[in-house]
From Swiss-Prot:
Start and end residues of each stretch annotated as Disordered: 1-36
Purpose: Microtubule inner protein (MIP) part of the dynein-decorated doublet microtubules (DMTs) in cilia axoneme, which is required for motile cilia beating.
Provenance organism: Homo sapiens (Human)
GO CC terms of this entry: axonemal B tubule inner sheath; axoneme; ciliary basal body; sperm flagellum
Protein name according to UniProt: Cilia- and flagella-associated protein 90
A GO biological process held by the record: flagellated sperm motility
Main location: cytoplasm
Keyword Cytoplasm: yes
Subcellular location: Cytoplasm, Cytoskeleton, Cilium axoneme; Cytoplasm, Cytoskeleton, Flagellum axoneme
Alphabetized InterPro entries for the sequence: CFAP90
Length: 147
C-alpha cells in the first residue's frame, strides 16, 4: 500500500499550467521557439545565430562597464553598435537598404565601367580652363566674378 503512493513534491502539487482560453489566443499567436528554415527564407539571407539568454541573466548579470559612445548604455544596439549591417547587406542577392553607403553594390556592378571617353572629358575640362570664354565672364547665368 505504501509502494503505490507517489512521492509528494512541489511539482506534483502544482500540476500542469493551464493554457489560456481560446478567446485569448490569436490565430497568429504561435511563434516557434527556433526557426530552422534555410537562409534563403530569412530577411538577412543568413542562418539565424540566436543565443539562449535566461531572464535571470538579463536582469541580474548586466555588464557594469560604461560605454561612452552610447546615448544610454542600457540599450544594447543603440546607434547600430555591435551590429554587422554592411556584412548582412553584402550577403543578400538583392540590396534592401537604399542609403548611399549600403545600397550601392560596388562588388556587383550593374554594368561594366566604360572608360572610353575619359580622355575626351579631360580635354574638354582643360579647354574650358585654359581658354578665355566670354559667356562665362558676362553677367548673367553662369557668371563667374573674379575675386
Amino acid at each position: 500500500m505504501e509502494d503505490d503512493e507517489e512521492e509528494t513534491t512541489a511539482s506534483t502539487l502544482r500540476g500542469k499550467p493551464r493554457p489560456p482560453p481560446v478567446s485569448a489566443q490569436s490565430a497568429f499567436s504561435y511563434i516557434p521557439p527556433r526557426r530552422l528554415d534555410p537562409k534563403e527564407h530569412s530577411y538577412y539571407y543568413r542562418p539565424a545565430r540566436t543565443g539562449i539568454i535566461s531572464l535571470y541573466d538579463c536582469i541580474f548579470k548586466r555588464r557594469l562597464d560604461y560605454d561612452q559612445k552610447l546615448h544610454r548604455d542600457d540599450r544594447e544596439h543603440a546607434k547600430s553598435l555591435g551590429l554587422h549591417v554592411n556584412e548582412e547587406e553584402q550577403e543578400r542577392p538583392v540590396g534592401v537598404l537604399t542609403s548611399s553607403v549600403y545600397g550601392k553594390r560596388i562588388n556587383q556592378p550593374i554594368e561594366p565601367l566604360n572608360r572610353d571617353f575619359g580622355r575626351a572629358n579631360h580635354v574638354q575640362a582643360d579647354f574650358y580652363r585654359k581658354n578665355d570664354i566670354p559667356s562665362l565672364k558676362e553677367p548673367g547665368f553662369g557668371h563667374i566674378a573674379p575675386s
